[in-house]
Every structure is written in C-alpha cells, then in structure tokens.
Regions:
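N-terminal leader/linker segments that precede catalytic domains of diphosphate-processing enzymes
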Residues: 1-72, 77-95, 99-133, 164, ...
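NUDIX/MutT-family hydrolases
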Residues: 138-175
Length: 228
C-alpha cells in the first residue's frame, strides 16, 4: 500500500492567500524591480519540520565567481529547455541538492528582482515540500553544504539585524548557525516572512558588519544566483 499524501498544514494558509494579492507581492521587490534582464529563478522550499515550517538554503562554494561562501536559496539561470521559471527553480534545486522535485508543490511566484552584480532578473518560486526527500551537495564546485533552518530560528529576534554595505546599501539580515544571510536572499526571506505572517518584532536599529569575505563582488546585491 502507498502511504497517504500529507495534508497541507494550516500554517501555509496565510502565505497561500497572500500569493494571490499582486500588490503585496510587488511590495516585496519594490526596491529592486526587474528590468527585463536575463531570467533566473530561486526556490524557496518550505517544509514541515519538528518545530513547524522550515526552509532550505544552500551555502555556496568558496570558489564561486560571485556570492562565494554565502547562504542563498538554490537556483540559477533559466535554460531554453525549461517550461517556465518554476521549472527553472525546481531543476536547479534538484541539480544542487538532489531533492526529488516530484514531492514539491509550487505555491506561487514573486515578481522578478534585479541583481546588478550578476545581471539577472531573479524570480523567487515558493513551494511546499509535500514529500521530503534526502538532500546533499551534488557538486562541491557549486555548494559547500545544504541547510534546512526552522522558521522559529529565522524569526528569533536575537538572530535579526540590518547590514550596511560600504556602498551605502542597507537591508535586512539573519545571523544563523554562524553565517550571515543578507542581500537578495535576506530581502526575499524577509518579504516571505511578512507574507506568511511569521514575522516577530525585532530591533531594526541593530546593525551588524558584513564579513570581509562576503565583500568580494563589485555590487551590493549578494545572495542571489550566479550564471551556471
């Protein structure tokens, strides 16, 4: 006998409803709207863990041309063979982490956000990890580790801060497991937490430095996909 399909948890309801409100989606990328550049996509994969919702991240390999060593959502540039940007995000996630895409349900997409350092319009694809599968680094040239982080950890006020780039860029950040999530990844994550109703109050006056090892790109748009 096959096991029954898991029911979608109630904590996804608010996010699912928000994904039908275009004005709210536009707000997430209002500070960096798409410009018609080369398309790319990232997968914001939400699973049901022991402590409630959790999200998958990839630590990018130290040798990557851009965003080296940083925490990002799995993703990359669109291929001509992709049916759409959701297909791009699922394909890239499978290539990077080995996740079984047949156990993933796409919930919706955000409008594209422009990443100047890589020249991509990046579309975030939100998905429910209906049937979790094993994940691991598939190519050490692209990723150093796969991290699945509970939303309770991401929203802990002790882990929230803002960063200020030498260029003047300021934005949200998350301090998790010894890493700093910032740039586009933190921007999208912060927006998704708002859409889902998962945010908790935090000290927005707290500013933390960006590690020097993260300041190797020309522009302050770190945390997004590179051209694979």
């Amino acid at each position: 006998m096959t096991s029954p399909e898991p029911e979608r948890p109630e904590w996804l309801d608010t996010l699912t409803e928000a994904l039908s409100e275009q004005s709210r989606l536009d707000q997430v990328v209002a500070l960096r709207p798409g410009v018609g550049a080369r398309p790319a996509a990232v997968l914001i994969l939400i699973g049901d863990g022991p402590d409630g919702p959790e999200i998958m991240f990839v630590e990018r390999a130290a040798g990557m041309r851009t965003h080296a060593g940083q925490i990002a959502f799995p993703g990359g540039a669109a291929d001509l063979a992709d049916h759409d940007l959701a297909d791009t995000a699922l394909r890239e996630a499978a290539e990077e982490t080995g996740v079984d895409r047949t156990g993933i349900d796409v919930l919706g997409v955000l409008p594209p956000a422009y990443v100047e350092v890589s020249g991509f319009d990046v579309t975030a694809v939100l998905a429910w990890w209906r049937k979790p599968s094993p994940v691991a680094v598939m190519d050490s040239r692209e990723a150093a580790s796969i991290d699945i982080v509970p939303v309770t950890v991401l929203t802990d006020p002790a882990h929230r801060a803002r960063v200020r780039h030498p260029s003047g860029y300021t934005g949200p950040a998350f301090e998790v497991n010894g890493h700093l999530i910032w740039g586009l990844t933190a921007h999208l994550l912060d927006g998704v937490l708002d859409l889902a109703g998962w945010q908790r109050p935090w000290d927005r006056s707290r500013v933390v430095p960006i590690p020097v090892r993260y300041l190797t790109d020309r522009r302050p748009d770190h945390g997004g996909p590179d051209a694979h």
